[in-house]
Structures are given as C-alpha cells and as structure tokens.
Amino acid sequence: MTYYKLKIFLLIFAFSNLLACSANKSYELKGNTFGTIYYIFIEDDKSLNSNEIHSNIKYILNIIDNSASNYKNNSEISVLNKFKPDAFKTISSNLFNIINKAKIVGDMTNGYFDITLGDIKISKGFYLNKKGSKRNGRRNYTYKDIILSDKNLIKKTFPNMNIDLSGIAKGYAVDLIFNYLMSKNISNFVINIGGEIKTFSKNKDFINLAIDDPTNNQQYIEEVSLNNNSIATSGTYIDTVDFEGLEISHITNPKTQQNVSNLNLLVSVIHDECAI
C-alpha cells in the first residue's frame, strides 16, 4: 500500500480508496490557524464551489480562534483568564461548549486531562506572549473548580486560575467543520488541523494513515484505518522549551504538576468526536 506523507505533526496520509474514484472531482483547501496549519481534502461526484466552502471554513476557524486561543491576548479565553471577580461571567456558546467538553474529558481520564494547567506552562516559558512568574509550591485547584451554569455562565472558583484550551480547541473546530461539510452532502473528505483528523466516506471506505515514530521520522510505528471517525495525536516531542537547562515538553502531568521531560512519547486517540 502506498502512503503519501504530509508534514503535519508527523502523520502520513493515504487517500488510496478515495483517489480510486477517478471520475470524482477533488479539492484541497489549506491554510494557517491556531498557530499551525490545516489541510482539508474533499472529493465528490458533483462540482462544488470550493471558494465558498473554504470561505465558510475560514469563518468557523476564525470564530474558534477568537474564542479559544491562548496565544491571542484579546481572545475570549484570555479575557476570561484575566477576570478576577468571584462571580459568574457570560461567555459565548462555543467557549461554553469547549470548556464543558474539556470537563467531560477530564472526568473520562480520571483528571489527567486538566485545562487549568495554563499557569504552570506560562511559568515554564510556554506562550511567549504571556508573562508568568516562577511558581512556588503546589496549587490546590483543578478543572473541577470551574463551574458552568445555564445560559452560558461560567465561574472560576479560584480567580487566578488560567484555563488552557490548546488540547481541545483544534478538535472542537474539526468537529464543527465536519458538521458543516456534512450539511453540504459531500461524498468524501478528510479534515486535518495540526494533527487532529476526522474523515467521512459516503461509501464507508477506510482512509489509511500511518503514525511516525517520534524517535525517527523516517519510520512509522503504527498503521490505522479510519472509517467516519477521528484521530487526535499529541507527543512530548512536538512543543518543547529549555527550562533551567532541561528540555521539557508542553505536556504537563496534573497529578505531579510537572512538565514531562521524556521527549519520545506519543499518543493517538480514536473516537467519533475529534474533541474527545
């Protein structure tokens, strides 16, 4: 089987089943978002207005970026992180949904997925646009201390809590784009935002992927086939900084409150929802 390598978080694509339908028309949409790149492959037996589709996709991406980006000082999540009063605050439905899903994933992983680790990452030198001081001692809050209420209301029970959505925002955007493309009755497509991937095939064809070895990007360690579902991949080698002479990963263990220093780890999760 032939695999075509696409340099996005070291994932390898094979569109062998889709491309076999030579009578179909194919479209490639790509660009930059969330500090990474996105790539969308579409195939259909009818002509599509790819410019209109791409424009609507960019609109979706822009909405989520402005809501959930920790890199933008004026994004909705950045404004929320600066909000100190011990009171509820109204947020957009998208931000509410992202945080709600993050809390669900936190419960599913026994607390190992925790969106309140932003202050630790900032103190170690991640997010260069943010200023943070070196932390002393352990902090005593988790994602469970974020309270969500009706009508898109949120309350941080610890005002200095810094919510980091980088582990879920891309997947949430992938799911929104998936729903949009489904509404257009498109036959086959693959969505990839920085390694967060979701596929659809009207004929339920499998789309084959291979995942690179984090220790040697000339080799791959696993082959997977997707059939109308998602895969999200992250690794300790992807985003690192030098902290006090030690190279550390952006991935933080919420139990120890320490960044992972083993830079050869990678995990992929397959699920119906890319945000999960």
Locations of the language-model features?
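Mature catalytic core of soluble alpha/beta enzymes
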Residues: T2-F9, L19-I276
